[in-house]
């Protein structure tokens, strides 16, 4: 067992995959990398990493269960998207990474963004919504002037925004469009992110970034009007649900 990091309530127990378990999964046909040192990987799994990973898993499970109530809507989660990526991307070791270069302080700055999860909702008419999910645990700076060596929300916003303006998402993922969903820890942090977004984008692409918290999702459901953005509050992820502003469809699923 790797850990249990909640103080109250029914705490989930987290177990690591050891060599024997990996061997069994491989024998059952799962794609398990045999060269990995699972003991070392488990030892490196500290509490912040576990908390972040569990929060991602919780969000994906909420989405999966919520979408079951909407028959005809398919959910493609992360690696399920890979077969639909351009051929060159499918061959890459890091197919989910968007790399961009843009001017900053008189020099060209190269950065990359990798979503915590990439996913698509595919509707009965084969239109779809594409989302990059980011989980913010409240530990990273929202705004940092150090873009070269330090992680920050600003750096992620810059990466996604310039990837969008340079159409990197279309080149790498084959997406005609996408939105970034950020789950964070408080309303005040959302407001700080919205301020950072406005400074980064200059007010362009206001509907590209949406934000929510666990409290909002508990009240409205993860698909419902729990999301807020630069254009306003009360935004739903599904077109069939009440929303303050419908999300435009991204493109037709291949």
Locations of regions flagged by a protein language model:
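Active-site metal-binding core of divalent-cation-utilizing nuclease and nuclease-like domains
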Residues: 4, 71-132, 152-155
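Short, flexible loop/turn elements at secondary-structure junctions
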Residues: 19-21, 82, 119-123, 137-139, ...
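Internal, hydrophobic cores of structured domains that mediate oligomerization or house catalytic pockets
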Residues: 27-34, 44-89, 114-118
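Surface-exposed cleft-lining segments at the edges of enzyme active sites
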Residues: 42-48, 85-87, 98-108, 139-148
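Non-catalytic C-terminal interaction segments of nucleic acid-processing enzymes
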Residues: 141-254
């Amino acid at each position: 067992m790797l850990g249990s990091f909640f103080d109250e309530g029914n705490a989930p127990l987290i177990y690591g995959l050891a060599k024997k378990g990996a061997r069994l999964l491989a024998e059952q046909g799962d794609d398990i990398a045999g060269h990995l040192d699972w003991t070392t990987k488990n030892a490196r799994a500290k509490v912040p990493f576990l908390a972040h990973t569990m929060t991602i898993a919780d969000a994906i499970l909420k989405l999966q269960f919520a979408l079951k109530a909407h028959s005809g809507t398919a959910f493609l989660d992360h690696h399920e998207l890979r077969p639909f990526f351009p051929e060159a991307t499918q061959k890459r070791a890091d197919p989910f990474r968007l790399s961009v270069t843009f001017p900053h302080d008189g020099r060209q700055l190269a950065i990359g963004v990798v979503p915590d999860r990439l996913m698509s909702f595919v509707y009965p008419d084969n239109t779809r919504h594409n989302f990059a999910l980011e989980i913010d645990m409240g530990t990273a700076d929202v705004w940092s002037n150090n873009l070269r060596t330090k992680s920050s929300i600003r750096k992620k916003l810059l990466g996604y925004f310039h990837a969008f303006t340079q159409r990197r998402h279309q080149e790498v993922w084959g997406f005609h469009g996408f939105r970034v969903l950020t789950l964070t820890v408080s309303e005040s942090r959302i407001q700080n992110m919205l301020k950072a977004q406005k400074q980064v984008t200059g007010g362009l692409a206001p509907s590209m970034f949406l934000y929510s918290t666990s409290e909002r999702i508990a009240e409205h459901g993860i698909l419902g009007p729990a999301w807020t953005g630069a254009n306003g509050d009360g935004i739903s992820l599904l077109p069939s649900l009440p929303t303050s502003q419908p999300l435009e469809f991204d493109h037709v699923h291949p």
